[in-house]
From Swiss-Prot:
It comes from Methanocaldococcus jannaschii (strain ATCC 43067 / DSM 2661 / JAL-1 / JCM 10045 / NBRC 100440). Belongs to the eukaryotic ribosomal protein eL30 family. Pfam families: Ribosomal_L7Ae. InterPro entries: Ribosomal_eL30, Ribosomal_eL30-like, Ribosomal_eL30-like_sf, Ribosomal_eL30_CS, Ribosomal_eL8/eL30/eS12/Gad45. GO terms for biological process: translation. One of its GO terms (cellular component) is cytosolic large ribosomal subunit. One of its GO terms (molecular function) is RNA binding. Keywords: Ribonucleoprotein, Ribosomal protein. This is Large ribosomal subunit protein eL30. Coiled coil: none annotated. The lineage of its organism: Archaea, Methanobacteriati, Methanobacteriota, Methanomada group, Methanococci. PANTHER family: RIBOSOMAL PROTEIN L30. The gene is rpl30e. The keyword Endoplasmic reticulum does not apply.
Amino acid sequence: MRRRENMDVNKAIRTAVDTGKVILGSKRTIKFVKHGEGKLVVLAGNIPKDLEEDVKYYAKLSNIPVYQHKITSLELGAVCGKPFPVAALLVLDEGLSNIMELVEKKEGGE
């Protein structure tokens, strides 16, 4: 069941990257979140602790939800269609993706 949920989230992330506006990378994510921009932050499961704390701190100040994904940064990069690791990403516009619904449902169920 959990694997199915991860696949749904992965598909939603990819759809958001392809059809919406997504910022990749922890530095750029923090920069945008500090200005209160964005709808959702997605963090890789192996993001360094200091970066995780920074992103979560600024996201909380800006009232932007944070989703901690179970996959590694290399896998998150692959989900985004990139040949490099992605430790954090920020969804500015989800496009045709249902990522916001999936994350809300998943957080409500846990």
